[in-house]
Amino acid sequence: MNMNTAPKQYGFYMPAEWYPHERCWMAWPCHHETWSKIGLDKAKMAYARVAKAIAQFEPVTLLVNPGDEDSAENLCKGHNIEIISLPINDSWTRDTGATFLINNERQLAGVDWIHNAWGGNYADCSLDNLIASHLIKYTEAQYFHAPLVMEGGSFHVDGEGTILTSKECLLNSNRNPHLSQQEIEQYLINYLGAERIIWLNMGLIGDETDGHVDEIATFIAPGKVLCLITKDKEDPNYHRLQENFEILKSSKDARGRTFEVYTVEQPPATYLNGERLTLSYINFYMANQGIVMPAFGYESFDRLAYQLFVQIFPGYQITQIDALDVFSGGGGIHCITQQQPKSHKLVE
């Protein structure tokens, strides 16, 4: 059944990423322009590393362009990974897949946002704009269409009423120029089932998504956030990351808690074909009892980030994998994944 009204009215909300998952959704690399820096073959191997790491903890369902199934099966077969043929433009299910919701009866719903290729970065996103509806139909979830240009990487939730996002992305004129900040807030609250929004200002320099929050800060537990920083005052990210840190330190969540703020340092500036990559340890995937986080080849930075994750995620197995090739495409581990929470079937 389709509903033209917002999910919150029916008791649906987006749970936190630490809520138990049914599966993780990914899509197989296929867009030559996206992967021009390293080539599609290396991109596929990088995605396979991520998929197999996540599949240690939960099932992975991989969307693959028709005709490209062999490469996916060769690299991923037999690792708790299901392959589904579906025409796609690109491979960022965080942004193009459905945003899954649950209610107190643990019934499943999905939000289908409007996708415009991150403000028109790519000419054709017509197939990717259909992915969310395919996922919602496949999972037999309740369907909600949101009349808002939005990507899943542009917000985080704590599942207890709080949304974390950035002004650089959501208030960008290439997304929803006809809407005010207050109107966008109301859409987010109604479609994510929340009460309060915390606005950070700027994302990372050179982020082609216009400052997605999943590169700079995230919830790690109720009342706790992890924030990206740099100690290098000459780095152009220094002031914007420091400002975000100060905002989080002075903010309260929907339940009135002042945040306990943890920080992780960004790795050194890294360039590929003259362009700085937006590397961030914040861009990880939280699976069932496991964390899949990136390594970038900087031993001391990678080690310190790993040790921090061991500390802040007690009870989770931390898996750190080489993710530089994933980030060469403009995003990270969180960007190429989308969790589906555990749920019960809707009662007809």
Curated annotation (Swiss-Prot):
One of its GO terms (molecular function) is protein-arginine deiminase activity. It is an enzyme of class 3 (hydrolase). Pfam families: PAD_porph (PF04371). It catalyses: agmatine + H2O = N-carbamoylputrescine + NH4(+). Its EC number is 3.5.3.12. Belongs to the agmatine deiminase family. This is Putative agmatine deiminase. The lineage of its organism: Bacteria, Pseudomonadati, Pseudomonadota, Gammaproteobacteria, Legionellales. The gene is aguA.
